[in-house]
Amino acid sequence: MLLLLAEYLQQFHKGFAVFQYLTLRGILGVLTALALSLWLGPWMIRTLQVRQIGQAVRNDGPQSHLSKKGTPTMGGALILTAIAVSTLLWADLSNRYVWVVLAVTLLFGAIGWVDDYRKVIEKNSRGLPSRWKYFWQSVFGLAAAIFLYMTAQSPVETTLILPLLKDVSIPLGIGFVVLTYFVIVGSSNAVNLTDGLDGLAILPTVMVAGALAVFCYLSGNVNFAEYLLIPYVPGAGELIVFCAALVGAGLGFLWFNTYPAQVFMGDVGALALGAALGTIAVIVRQEVVLFIMGGVFVMETLSVIIQVASFKLTGKRVFRMAPIHHHFELKGWPEPRVIVRFWIITVILVLIGLATLKLR
């Protein structure tokens, strides 16, 4: 929006041309989203408290979680508001990738909002039934996948790229739609499963988004892409603004979500942010790198799959409780220790993901 204004004002003063730079708009995107989160956060928390929109706590979970009962939830709406406003202000709104990622984020956020609303407002412990949740995730995920497939401008945009192997790429054809669907829906649910402790999901999400911003910048620049032997995706660089907005909004939310949390993001935030990461990774053809950098999300998801499969097949549980962060809590780890150690793991995995840019 403001980019269009700056382009118009260039005829009066050439200094407005500075807003053409992605890096500047990315910085402004971070600061705008951060400021909005910090400004609106206290108001949102008070509003949620007044309306008694509080978190329900499982009785069979760690006893330390009983004190969290009633903590305001659905705070993810704050994150999505900050992301949307910042992106609309600073991004090039003629870029199709910006609209795809923003639409996926808000639509998955809507699914989470309905789920949270039914749990908290209507006091329905089941929330949105799983079959309907996955149905709408599938509808929106497939819609995004088909759109990206139909609008691909070169074969590389639908090719699977394997990091570390510079001469290996796998043309997917229509299989691109299937892969994209699983990446978007899988990422969405993985982040949601991770969101069980104060700040556990949001900081890894911020770190992965920051790393994806680097991939967006490099993939959107033909010279850098050729030098680093990564796919050149025209227009992908504009997603820096979205990634930056996510980083700013996430850090602002963490201010209130850090232990002991004043607010939880709820499904409205977790489902949306996971879907956003998956969509961005697909656009810049870095699905495998997302799997690496989001290793904490993968670990949480696998722990649930293993736990359910083991119990159904053998009647025994592998972990004391799943997702795995609860397993460590029940082993006696204090909540802050679990959180910080998972953050440290994410830092390491993100650095490994970034290292794949040169290790080819």
UniProtKB/Swiss-Prot annotation:
The keyword Ribonucleoprotein does not apply. Pfam families: Glycos_transf_4 (PF00953). Its main location: membrane. This is Phospho-N-acetylmuramoyl-pentapeptide-transferase. The gene is mraY. GO terms for cellular component: plasma membrane. CDD domains: GT_MraY (cd06852). The chain crosses the membrane at residues 25-45, 73-93, 97-117, 132-152, 168-188, 199-219, 236-256, 263-283, 288-308, 338-358. It is a multi-pass membrane protein. It comes from the Bacteria. Its cofactor is Mg(2+). NCBIfam families: mraY (TIGR00445). It is found in: Cell inner membrane. Catalyzes the initial step of the lipid cycle reactions in the biosynthesis of the cell wall peptidoglycan: transfers peptidoglycan precursor phospho-MurNAc-pentapeptide from UDP-MurNAc-pentapeptide onto the lipid carrier undecaprenyl phosphate, yielding undecaprenyl-pyrophosphoryl-MurNAc-pentapeptide, known as lipid I. Belongs to the glycosyltransferase 4 family. MraY subfamily. It catalyses: UDP-N-acetyl-alpha-D-muramoyl-L-alanyl-gamma-D-glutamyl-meso-2,6-diaminopimeloyl-D-alanyl-D-alanine + di-trans,octa-cis-undecaprenyl phosphate = di-trans,octa-cis-undecaprenyl diphospho-N-acetyl-alpha-D-muramoyl-L-alanyl-D-glutamyl-meso-2,6-diaminopimeloyl-D-alanyl-D-alanine + UMP. GO terms for molecular function: metal ion binding; phospho-N-acetylmuramoyl-pentapeptide-transferase activity; UDP-N-acetylmuramoyl-L-alanyl-D-glutamyl-meso-2,6-diaminopimelyl-D-alanyl-D-alanine:undecaprenyl-phosphate transferase activity. One of its GO terms (biological process) is peptidoglycan biosynthetic process. Its EC number is 2.7.8.13. Pathway: Cell wall biogenesis; peptidoglycan biosynthesis. Keywords: Cell cycle, Cell division, Cell inner membrane, Cell membrane, Cell shape, Cell wall biogenesis/degradation, Magnesium, Membrane, Metal-binding, Peptidoglycan synthesis, Transferase, Transmembrane, Transmembrane helix. It is an enzyme of class 2 (transferase). Coiled coil: none annotated.
